[in-house]
Structure formats: C-alpha cells, structure tokens
C-alpha cells in the first residue's frame, strides 16, 4: 500500500492537497525557498502534526510559529493529521521564509489540506465480521493465528430456472445469492465534498478479472438493485464520494477454484486519484488493498458421518437396492435413488461424481466434482444436485483421452494423518496411476492439477493400472474405529485368501464349494481344493499381491501408517487378456462405510458348516472393533460388470469440524 507521498511547495503560492489518514506527507522546504532565504518557521492547524526532519532526526513542531530552523538541503517536513476534515482545505501548514537578519518573512508557502479517511475492509481475522482497517488485510497467512479474508466460489444455483451456476453470469436474482459472497466495506469519512478533480476508484488486475466478481447493492425508491461492478470485462469502478461518515457495502464472489497457474489469491484495490489538468492522466495518491483466498474444494473421508446415500435404480438391481435401503435405515442418513429416466442405464454413480464441500467463516456448502467420464449419468449432477447451497465443479481435458482411471472410483481420500511430524488434518487425496515407467493409464492431467492446487489434501499417486478397471477402491478402504478418532486401512490381499483357504483345507474342508446357490456358477463346483491346485491362478495372484504390496508400501510411507494400522481382507483376482486383474469373487474391500455399519459385497465363499468362511473371517476381523458387517448380494447386478457395492453407491458426508485455514500446507 502507498502510505507515504511527496507534496511540492512553491513560495508565494498556495498548494492544495488531500491527505488520507494513516499516511505521511513529505515536503522539501529547501527546494521551495525563495532566493536569499536562510531560515524558516512553521505554523499549522490544531489537527495537523508536523515534524522537521534533518539528517534523519525528527523534531516535533509547535503550532505558534515562533521557532526557527536553518534551511539546508537535508531538511524536510513530515506531515500527518489526527482526524478527518469537516470542510475542504480547512487545515493548513504555513512556511515562513526569512533572510539572514530579518525578523519579517520575505515570503511564505502554504499547504492547504483536506483530510479524509479511506479504508477498504474485509473479514481479515476470519471471525465472520468485517472489521475496520485490519493491518493484515493486504496479506494472507495459513494457520490458527493466520490472517486474510476468504472467498467462496459461487458455484451453486439459487434460482432453479437458470441452467448454470451463479458464478457463470453477472447477475444477482435474490438476497440468498448474496449470502454465498464475502462482504467488503469501503469506509470513508471527510467533508461534504472533496476539492475538484479527485476520484475514488475500485479496481482489479486483468489477471484476476476472470477469478473474482464484485456487486454493489443500490436502494432506489422501488426496491433493491444488484449492480455488477467488477469482474470479467470490468476492471474498475468509480465510487461516488458521499461526504461525512459513510460505509459502502460490496459483495464479492469467487469465479473459479485454485488450479494450475492460479494459487487462489486475488486482490482488490481502492485508489484515490488526483486531477492535474485536462488531457493529463489522473494520478494515484493513495491505494488500499485487500487480499482474498478462494476456498479450496475439500473431499470427505469414510470416517465422517454420512448425510445421504445415492444409488441407481436399474432393471436388474431390485434386490441390491432393497438391501442397501435396509442398511441405510440402520443409520441416521437418507437414501436417494437415481431412477432410470435419469441414469439412462448407467449404474456406476461412484464413478461419475465425488462429493466435497467448500467453507468460509461466514458460510459453507457441499460441492460435487463431476468426473470427465461423462457416462449416461452425466446429466445427474447438474439436474439433481446443483441447486441452492449445493455447488458444482468439473474439469474436462481438452486434448487428453479419457480412460477408466478418470472415473472417481479412482479418487479417494484418507482420514487425517501425521507423517514424519507433518500433519494433514484433512487427510490426503489418493488417486490410482500407472506403474512408474510403464507408460500405462493415468488420471488426466487437468484433474490431477485441480486436486493438487487445492493444497489442503496433498495428493498421493498409487498404482492401480494393474487392475482391469484400474480404481483404487478395488484394493483399499478406510473404516473408523467406533468411539475413537482412529481408523484402520483395509486392503485386499490375495495372500490372506490363500492362507485362509489352506487352513480350511487342512481342517478337512477342501471340498467346500464356492458360489453355492448361484446356478451356473455353483454347478462348476469351484472348491477350495480346485483353487489351491490351479497353479496358473496361484502364480497370477502372487503377481497381484506384489502389486498390492507396492501400494501398501506407498500408503505406509505417505500416510505414516504401520502394519498395526492395516487389516488384510481376503481377495482373489484372475488375469484378463490384457494381463490385468479382475475380481474372482465379489471384492469385499469395495464396501460402503456408514459410521460403524459396513455394506460389504457378499463374497459367496466356500461353505464351511453351512456358513461362508470368507464372511466368518471378515466378521472376526472387524466386529470385535465395534463395526457391524452387512453382506450385500451384488454379484449379478454389479460384480459381473466388474464392480461392487462401493462402485454402485455414493455417499455425501458431513464436512470436517476442522477449519481448513487453520492448517499449514
């Protein structure tokens, strides 16, 4: 901010200047002196404070003008004022010049001042209230003691008949829309009018013009008008000076999220401009600046309480839908069914969208991230989710091809973790990628850049390209430990499956049949003995376990986990024609987590004493922790199409109680 400026005096004339409270005026009395002048004296008004500065030493000046000072090239005056003027040019500083012997001034110079107060204010201390002239308002710092205002992307839709998000136009249709915006106040105080030629201007830079918008509310006789004054094509706005003590209220909206090449910081400035002469540009004599950070999009991990469970209604999933409904009824959340007219035959609701939220001190709301997958569910997030206090954002590649890894079964987030002393209070984003140097499939760069730019959930890339579908939710999930703030990582494990089957074979259950009661599948009599004797299947799953262990090591390193934090769930895979893995039986780790209630794919494992040994094993691992296991039959409606329970459902969860601005990325 411009807090000091120079005013040039001229002997024998009167110079008028507008002074802004909180700044300094400097003037060179030596250069303004008439020929022959040797000393000078000063007089000033009651509310003006003047210092004579010589060789870096300052001396306060009394108001009566009796004291004399020698003129020298190093002598300057520093002028400040204590309060706003009541009339234009009513405060003054008079410099009297004297020759070597005279007691009567040979000439004088006058500085006539109009003091005004200008302050552009925001909620820099993040308490939900716009305070006055916070000294930290022009900077932004992270942490619990941090300072700096916060802005929401206005990505919801308050008016149902509009086709797009509120931030996509330059209009405000209701007061509800203003509540999504951050308030900014321009406070002024001074005489009824300013000297001729002065202007107060709000402005933004060209680089910020597509990232922030500002509205002003007028109150004409016939109701309020919401006027768009800054953003997009509008870079500046002249503010009418009203005189006296005034507060002009503005509403600021974010237009886009942090992303590659955009840190999330935007600046808004107010300047006082001075008129010199016709055809001469106005000169800024004072500038005040505020900085906002646009709130990041934040994902919610499994440990947070569920709000809504989403599932698609298909021609072939009636029983699955019924079982999911029964599971949801055990919790405090609601079931939302996406019917066929909207899903158009697309059952993979997990792959189409990811729920998250944005938050500022004054407000927060959920925001859905729409994947570039764009299956037949592509209209669902805009038609059914986007609305009042429910935002929407998407990222689509311009030139890259979209692969299965761009579906959001390949996008998860861990619970809060601490890694080598570094805390991630909102967890870390987890995405699947290709094996290093393999040149395989990878999530498109535009989505990866977006996730990284949010800063608060630093992404970790895992290796998922070894799977046919290639999603991280095929080999991992997080579950809470009820009654604590702790969690466990569940990982698919082929070695755990072979170990369990060998134990059952040793106990005399080698002829136990898998897929019992499933018609054609059970007629093949797939037994424990056949699985253990299938050498090619054994070798394939040794390779798949190496892929799982690669991810296990990454997760332990990047999330600060130990073996005690991980539970292995039995899984088997078979290799497809591209040498990638698909589940041999329903993959139990691909579950839905609703607090302590887990909806787990029913594995149809070997029947030992008329019970599925896989279900018994998993219950024995999880239920002693306080978790409740419900096994859901998804084999015909999802498993045979290479997905499971998690792939066919989606959960919106409550936001973190932790405020993202309190962390240090």
UniProtKB/Swiss-Prot annotation:
Enzyme class name: hydrolase
Impact when changing residue 647 to A: Loss of enzyme activity
Protein residues bound to Ca(2+) 2: 154, 156, 158, 166, 177, 180
An annotated Gene Ontology molecular function: protein-arginine deiminase activity
EC numbers for this chain: 3.5.3.15
Phenotype when changing residue 412 to A: Strongly reduced enzyme activity
Tissue distribution of the protein: Detected in keratinocytes in epidermis (at protein level).
Keyword Cytoplasm belongs to the record: yes
Name of the protein: Protein-arginine deiminase type-2
Species in which this protein is naturally found: Homo sapiens (Human)
Organism lineage string: Eukaryota, Metazoa, Chordata, Craniata, Vertebrata
GN (gene name): PADI2
């Amino acid at each position: 901010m411009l807090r000091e400026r120079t005013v040039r005096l001229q002997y024998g004339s009167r110079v008028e200047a507008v002074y802004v409270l909180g700044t300094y005026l400097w003037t060179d009395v030596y250069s303004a002196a008439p020929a022959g002048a040797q000393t000078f004296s000063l007089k000033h008004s009651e509310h003006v404070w003047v210092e004579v500065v010589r060789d870096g030493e300052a001396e306060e000046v009394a108001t009566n003008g009796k004291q004399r000072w020698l003129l020298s090239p190093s002598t300057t005056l520093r002028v400040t004022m204590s309060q706003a003027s009541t009339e234009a040019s009513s405060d003054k500083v008079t410099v009297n010049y004297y020759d070597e012997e005279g007691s009567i001034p040979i000439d004088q110079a006058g500085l006539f001042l109009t003091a005004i107060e200008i302050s552009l204010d925001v909620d820099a201390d993040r308490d939900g209230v716009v305070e006055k002239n916070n000294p930290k308002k022009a900077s932004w710092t992270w942490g619990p003691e941090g300072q700096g205002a916060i802005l929401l992307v206005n990505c919801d839709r308050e008016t149902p008949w509009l086709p797009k998000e509120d931030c996509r136009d330059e209009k405000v249709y209701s007061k509800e829309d203003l509540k999504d915006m951050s308030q900014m106040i321009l406070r002024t105080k001074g005489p009824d009018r300013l000297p001729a030629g002065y202007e107060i201007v709000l402005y933004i830079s060209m680089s910020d013009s597509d990232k922030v918008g500002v509205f002003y509310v007028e109150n004409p006789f016939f109701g309020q008008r919401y006027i768009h004054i800054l953003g997009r094509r509008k870079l500046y706005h002249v503010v009418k000076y009203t005189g006296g003590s005034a507060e002009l209220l503005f509403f600021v909206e974010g237009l886009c999220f942090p992303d590659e090449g955009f840190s999330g910081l935007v600046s808004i400035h107010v300047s006082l401009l001075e008129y010199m002469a016709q055809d001469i540009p106005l000169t800024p004599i004072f500038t005040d600046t505020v900085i906002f950070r646009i709130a990041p999009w934040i994902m919610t991990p499994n440990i947070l309480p569920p709000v809504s469970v989403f599932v698609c209604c298909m021609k072939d999933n009636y029983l699955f839908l019924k079982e999911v409904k029964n599971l949801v009824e055990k919790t405090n959340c609601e079931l939302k069914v996406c019917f066929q007219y909207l899903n158009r035959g697309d059952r993979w609701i997990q792959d189409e969208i990811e729920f998250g939220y944005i938050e500022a001190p004054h407000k927060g709301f959920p925001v859905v991230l729409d994947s570039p997958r764009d299956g037949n569910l592509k209209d669902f997030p805009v038609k059914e989710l986007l609305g009042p206090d429910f935002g929407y954002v998407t990222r689509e590649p311009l030139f890259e091809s979209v692969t299965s890894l761009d579906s959001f079964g390949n996008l998860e987030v861990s619970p809060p973790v601490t890694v080598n002393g570094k805390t991630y209070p909102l967890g870390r984003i987890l995405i699947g990628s290709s094996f290093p140097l393999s040149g395989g499939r990878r999530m498109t760069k535009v989505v990866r850049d977006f996730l990284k730019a949010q800063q608060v959930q630093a992404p970790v890339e895992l290796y998922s390209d070894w799977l046919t579908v290639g999603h991280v939710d095929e080999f991992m999930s997080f579950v809470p430990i009820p009654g604590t703030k702790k969690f466990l990582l569940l990982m698919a494990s082929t070695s755990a499956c072979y170990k369990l089957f060998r134990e059952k074979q040793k106990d005399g259950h080698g002829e136990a049949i898998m897929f019992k009661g499933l018609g054609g599948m059970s007629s093949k009599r797939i037994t424990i003995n056949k699985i253990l004797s299938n050498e090619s299947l054994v070798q394939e799953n040794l390779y798949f376990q190496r892929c799982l262990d690669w991810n296990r090591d990454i997760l332990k390193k990047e999330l600060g986990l130990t073996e005690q934090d991980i539970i292995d769930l039995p899984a088997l895979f078979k290799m497809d024609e591209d040498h990638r893995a698909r589940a041999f039986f329903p993959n139990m780790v691909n579950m839905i987590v609703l607090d302590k209630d887990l909806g787990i794919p029913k594995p149809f494992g070997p029947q030992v004493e008329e019970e599925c040994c896989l279900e018994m094993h998993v219950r024995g691992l999880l239920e002693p922790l306080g978790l409740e296991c419900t096994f859901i039959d998804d084999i015909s409606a999802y498993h045979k199409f290479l997905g499971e329970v998690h792939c066919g459902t989606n959960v919106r969860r409550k936001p973190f109680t932790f405020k993202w601005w309190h962390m240090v990325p």
